[in-house]
Swiss-Prot record:
One of its GO terms (cellular component) is plasma membrane. It is found in: Cell membrane. Keywords: ATP synthesis, Cell membrane, CF(0), Hydrogen ion transport, Ion transport, Membrane, Transmembrane, Transmembrane helix, Transport. F(1)F(0) ATP synthase produces ATP from ADP in the presence of a proton or sodium gradient. F-type ATPases consist of two structural domains, F(1) containing the extramembraneous catalytic core and F(0) containing the membrane proton channel, linked together by a central stalk and a peripheral stalk. During catalysis, ATP synthesis in the catalytic domain of F(1) is coupled via a rotary mechanism of the central stalk subunits to proton translocation. Component of the F(0) channel, it forms part of the peripheral stalk, linking F(1) to F(0). This is ATP synthase subunit b. The chain crosses the membrane at residues 2-22. It comes from Clostridium botulinum (strain ATCC 19397 / Type A). F-type ATPases have 2 components, F(1) - the catalytic core - and F(0) - the membrane proton channel. F(1) has five subunits: alpha(3), beta(3), gamma(1), delta(1), epsilon(1). F(0) has three main subunits: a(1), b(2) and c(10-14). The alpha and beta chains form an alternating ring which encloses part of the gamma chain. F(1) is attached to F(0) by a central stalk formed by the gamma and epsilon chains, while a peripheral stalk is formed by the delta and b chains.
Amino acid sequence: MNISIPQIIAAILNFIILLLIVKHFWFDKITAVVDSRQSEIINKIEDTDKNQKLALELKEKNELELSNAKKQGKTIVEEYKSKAENVYEDIVKEAHEEADRIIKKSRLEAERQKKNAEEEIRAEAVELAVLVSSKTLEKTIDDLEHRRLIKDFISKVGI
């Protein structure tokens, strides 16, 4: 295959003419389509970047709200725990006070019963003393009999 210079020049001229025809009729349209597609791609990239930034902002906002909610929940739990402890302490304090009142009342009642018992013993002692005196007056007793009566009296009284 032989290639000659006039063929090369003819091919170059044909290519230039074809290029000029394409440029004149279709190059503006092709450039417009390419530019349109390029701007569309750029807009989509920008929208994607905006959406990604918005998503990150929303994520940070949600994480902050979640953190605040956890803190608030912890605060509420601690507050109710503190209130429950205060109620517990109040109940225990009231129980101790009630127990102290019951003990004091029981001691007072025991003291009252003790005094009543002492009064009864004194009354019995007086009665026994009167009885012993009347027996003594009824008969004359010697010193030994007198001591025996006193010992009986003391043993009955419980002194």
